[in-house]
């Protein structure tokens, strides 16, 4: 290269300063090419408010008609990431501070994305999930059984979710930059317990022996690192219910996972601010679009920085300190905000009320097999680590997830490689054929049937007991409630046999008035 430049210089008499400028430009281009080639993906983070109506709306989760919102514990958000190959496929994942995702919400979000981006984001590559908080506004789902307690569809809840999810994805799309993804896993032992341990013991010993615990205690974390800015986000998956806030709570809340997300985002921003205060000699890349020649103007920048007034009104005497503040301001103005999501996974019977279930009248442990107190389910409640303060329990369980996530985040070293891909399909669970092993050897093909809720369902759980005289584990039923059921829909013989030994309380899968009560065909991503 030097010989070529020397030759050009002899023939065209290029000034030495100009020659070195071109050399620097070539080196920068080569360096940029190397950086881009080392990045496997484009990554982008987004976050937007989805709080919705904060008063006079039934909350989604406990199916308690008396749980009406009357204020805000803390606001709810939709947090998104996009991962794309520069010239290939891309995927979107959205984590909601909501009880669950809604197909109706998803359809409307996809309509808006199509209007913006064409076929770039579709049902095939967009997945939306909820953290399963039981303290968010209800009325946004399309099946009757989920909106009975909210007395139907609530437009304000629906619109807040659609708007927030769309804007979160738009943010992530606009933040797409070359970057890398790291994965890490670890056990978190004190943030979830099995709330139905007697039911778990009904599983065959051979099945239970495959697992270390009676619930999943593994957290999996993805760390997103922007080539320019460094870490810009983390999403982790861990199983524990969003029921630290009780069924009598009336304040909108993201519960323990929403709290954990706020803790981690605050932690990162505080640490980032401290790092900027310590300062480095490296100037952010995008400053070059503001200042034509950074290095030639270095002294001028320092003089400018020293002329700034400090907070008490005195002249800043430490040039280096003021310069760092200028660099920090320039950096923060362009830097995407750090997004941390604490996502839900196989939380089934995993409760954050880790102290166990106790009778509220006597203080003794609830009946082990049926979670009752003197035969009544209404008196049996799980206790969180901050008992009797549910806000403290929310903070503690959130903090435990946050601490584990920070540990995994700081030690994440396994980098993800390979192609970006996705899978999506619609599965009709009301008539699904499944091959199962037979006792004594061999196998047989069985078929599912439309959904139905049993008597035990109405008993609720230790996180949120039901009403009346229902009991967990009830496989007999009750003549009175069968009579009430038949006023709505009497299940036929085929349906009863299919669900046996579970007695049917509500034949939701076959109830169609005024429209479907329960889903039959699920979309799986």
Predicted regions located by residue number:
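Classical eukaryotic N-terminal signal peptides for Sec-dependent ER targeting/secretion
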Residues: 1-25
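Non-catalytic substrate/cofactor recognition surfaces at enzyme active-site rims
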Residues: 20, 31-525
């Amino acid at each position: 290269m030097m010989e070529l430049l020397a030759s050009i210089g002899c023939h065209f008499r290029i000034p030495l300063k100009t020659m070195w400028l071109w050399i620097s430009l070539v080196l920068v281009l080569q360096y940029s090419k190397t950086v881009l080639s080392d990045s496997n993906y484009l990554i982008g983070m987004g976050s937007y408010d989805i709080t919705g109506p904060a008063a006079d709306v039934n909350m989604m989760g406990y199916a308690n008609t008396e749980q009406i919102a009357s204020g805000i514990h803390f606001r709810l958000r939709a947090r998104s990431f996009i991962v794309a190959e520069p010239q290939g496929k891309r995927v979107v994942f959205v984590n909601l501070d909501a009880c669950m995702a809604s197909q109706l919400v998803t359809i409307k979000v996809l309509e808006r994305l199509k209007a913006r981006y064409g076929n770039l984001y579709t049902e095939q590559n967009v997945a939306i999930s909820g953290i399963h908080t039981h303290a968010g506004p209800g009325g946004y789902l399309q099946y009757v059984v989920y909106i009975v307690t909210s007395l139907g569809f609530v437009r304000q809840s629906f619109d807040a979710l659609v708007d927030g999810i769309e804007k979160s994805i738009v943010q992530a799309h606009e933040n797409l930059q070359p970057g890398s993804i790291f994965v890490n896993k670890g056990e978190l032992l004190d943030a979830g317990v099995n709330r139905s341990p007697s039911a778990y013991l009904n599983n065959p010993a051979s099945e239970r022996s495959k697992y270390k615990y009676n619930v999943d205690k593994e957290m999996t974390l993805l760390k997103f690192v922007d080539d320019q800015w460094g870490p810009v986000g983390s999403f982790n998956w861990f199983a524990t219910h969003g029921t630290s806030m009780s069924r009598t709570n009336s304040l909108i809340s993201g519960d323990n996972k929403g709290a954990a997300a706020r803790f981690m985002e605050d932690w990162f921003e505080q640490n980032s601010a401290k790092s900027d205060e310590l300062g480095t000699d490296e100037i952010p890349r995008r400053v070059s679009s503001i200042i034509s020649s950074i290095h030639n103007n270095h002294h001028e920048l320092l003089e400018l920085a020293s002329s700034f007034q400090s907070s008490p009104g005195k002249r800043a005497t430490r040039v280096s300190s003021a310069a760092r503040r200028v660099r920090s301001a320039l950096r923060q103005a362009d830097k995407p905000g750090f997004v941390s999501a604490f996502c839900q996974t196989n939380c089934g019977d995993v409760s954050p009320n880790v102290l166990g279930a106790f009778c509220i009248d006597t203080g003794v442990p609830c009946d082990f097999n049926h979670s009752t107190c003197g035969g009544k389910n209404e008196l049996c409640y799980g206790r969180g680590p901050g008992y009797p303060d549910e806000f403290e329990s929310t903070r503690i369980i959130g903090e435990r997830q946050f601490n584990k996530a920070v540990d995994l985040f700081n030690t994440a070293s396994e980098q993800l490689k390979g192609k970006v891909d996705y899978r999506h399909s619609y599965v009709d669970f009301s008539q699904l054929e499944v091959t199962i092993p037979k006792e004594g050897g061999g196998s047989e093909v069985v078929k599912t049937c439309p959904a139905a809720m049993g008597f035990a369902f109405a008993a609720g759980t230790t996180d949120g007991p039901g009403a009346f005289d229902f009991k967990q584990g009830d496989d007999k039923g009750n003549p009175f409630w069968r009579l009430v059921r038949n006023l709505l829909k009497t299940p036929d013989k085929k349906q009863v046999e299919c669900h046996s030994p579970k007695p049917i309380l509500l034949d939701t899968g076959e109830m169609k008035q005024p429209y479907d009560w329960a889903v039959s065909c699920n979309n799986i991503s």
